[in-house]
Amino acid sequence: MATSQRKILVTSALPYANGPIHLGHMLEYIQTDIWSRYQKLRGHECHYICADDAHGTPIMLKAQQLGMAPEEMIAQVNKEHQQDFADFNIAFDNYHSTHSEENRVLASDIYLKLRANGYIKSKSISQLFDPEKSMFLPDRFVKGTCPKCKSPDQYGDNCDACGATYSPTELINPKSAVSGATPVMKDTEHFFFDLPAFEDMLKEWTRSGALQTEMANKLDEWFEQGLQQWDITRDAPYFGFEIPDAPGKYFYVWLDAPIGYMGSFKNLCDKHPELSFDEFWAKDSKAEVYHFIGKDIVYFHSLFWPAMLHGSGYRQPNSVYAHGYVTVNGAKMSKSKGTFIKARTYLDHLDPEYLRYYYAAKLSSRIDDLDLNLEDFVQRVNSDLVGKLVNLASRTAGFITKRFDGKLAKIADTTLTDAFLAKQEQIAEFYETREYGKAMREIMALADIANGFVADAAPWQLVKQDDQQETAHQVCSNALNLFRILVTYLKPVLPRLALDVEAFFQQTLTWDALNQDMAGHEIAPFKAMMQRVELEKVNAMVADSKENLQATSEPEAPKGPLATDPISDTINFEDFAKIDLRIARIVKAEHVAEADKLLKLQLDIGGETRQVFAGIKSAYSPEDLEGKLTVMVANLAPRKMRFGMSEGMVLAAGPGGSDLWILEPHEGAQPGMRVK
């Protein structure tokens, strides 16, 4: 056991209950599962809990489209999610749903405490209302013409074409995305959480070490912009929890979603009376609470969530750890390319241990995006897991079984064993600090040493010589003991392989048993533990992931982009000459808080720096853009936006969403050059 046992509660973000798990999701659950398994391997009391995020307008509408009750749909999705996670060897101690009695009670409790403490405000607001569906329309459920650039079919909060942000009421010719009806304005009373009241507490907490440096720096920007009152209300019809004392008013999904962590743990406590909910969540709790999340939901977890907990008398998490996005072959996951891969599709073709190892080998404590390069995936799995790790046992175990009664010899020279054991604290530190890539490199470096030892000793030659039998016994026993140590180090990453190795050694692999003397220990006959991954299987997985495109029944219809976006009316040369296009280098790119589609760009145009807000967040992460050359409209009148002044426009092509590409000039171009 560990010298000082810790009490730990760890969570992953709750997957939304309106669709399947994909490999982008799996990064987080694998990352968290490795950390949880490591804590348990060290003898700590660690509870890994999660749940489906099961409320909101999207779920209500999708259930209607499927002709199902929302409760029926989320139950079905929950079952599918749990099966996917189980097959990826994600070892939750409890998996629940935010649509639960535990969560309803806790959400109401927290709200009522916030209200009693003066942190809930009420005011009347005007919102767009769908007269056909008799429902208020959230931002994303209204579409119309952008009030800034006049582009049609834009959402109610942000324009894909020009990057402008606005309120739904500013749209030209707005239409309900639910029914197509023209919405009307209607007043409604909403409740707001007084987030600005917690600014001092949040500034202290975010700089306490609870967040990664990159996250804390981003929060400083949000503090500079000023915290806003947070609307926690949605009007009926809505699938969620009704707000106490407010008939027809429901909690916004982001209020009860993080409370789902508490609800799932309460459900676990009810199953295990020896567990105390208050021991982990009371204000004076000495237990540890950690949240693993994606970088896209930092705002909710590092501002709203700790403020809600503090204002209602609960403890704050020790840390919130964010990770980046998953790209495939250097690009955003794409359905048409077959790189938007569902967890189930992967499982139909490949061993989950492969992906667990590959993600671990590339994960760090930073918020960098992780690229799943499929060719590198094949090479790394085959080289590290099959060629180095399992091969160490496969080429030595047979000699022990056939020639030495299956029993290991006492190692006379422990130099290698001592060197392997000397790495345990460094590897432990890497696991603890989520530097999994560094841990994998240390472990594989040891595997190289072990394989070199076997290759140099050549036991297959020694067993042929009568006077070298004891040496052969020593070499093979030493190799297998090194293999045991390596797999123990890898047990959090490769749990199924660890089970196979435990069956082979006929004992449980534990951290405390790393230095166990294995002399005289009997092993079971060796069985194949891991197969090489073939590129053909990977290609078959990609083929199965490709979106089925419907063939058109009108062969003469226009094809390509012109089919949906015809060429505009002819203009005179004088009109074009008014536009000053310049080469610009993207010096810095940043996310914009509370903007779903915007990135803030700092552009060098040759002796002058411009700030531009661009609606390209769906296609690019900031780090992908920095250093690139692009083309900007340099003489566009500056436009004051909610987030600052935009001093131009960058050019991009594509229909939108993930299929959007900024223009990149030839490398010979220089910032400031005119495009003619």
Curated annotation (Swiss-Prot):
The UniProt keyword set, sorted, is:
Aminoacyl-tRNA synthetase, ATP-binding, Cytoplasm, Ligase, Metal-binding, Nucleotide-binding, Protein biosynthesis, RNA-binding, tRNA-binding, Zinc
Keyword RNA-binding on entry: yes
Top-level taxon of the source organism: Bacteria
Q: Motif location ('KMSKS' region)?
A: 332-336
Q: What is its main location?
A: cytoplasm
Subcellular location(s): the record lists: Cytoplasm
Q: Please name the GO terms that the record assigns under molecular function.
A: ATP binding; metal ion binding; methionine-tRNA ligase activity; tRNA binding
Might you give the EC number(s) for this enzyme? 6.1.1.10
Subunit note: Homodimer.
Cofactors demanded by this protein: Zn(2+)
Show where the record puts the motif 'HIGH' region: 15-25
Gene of this entry:
metG
Q: Which reaction does it catalyse?
A: tRNA(Met) + L-methionine + ATP = L-methionyl-tRNA(Met) + AMP + diphosphate
Give me the residues that bind ATP, please: 335
Give the protein's recorded name.
Methionine--tRNA ligase
- Which lineage is the organism of this entry classified under, starting from the top rank? Bacteria, Pseudomonadati, Pseudomonadota, Gammaproteobacteria, Alteromonadales
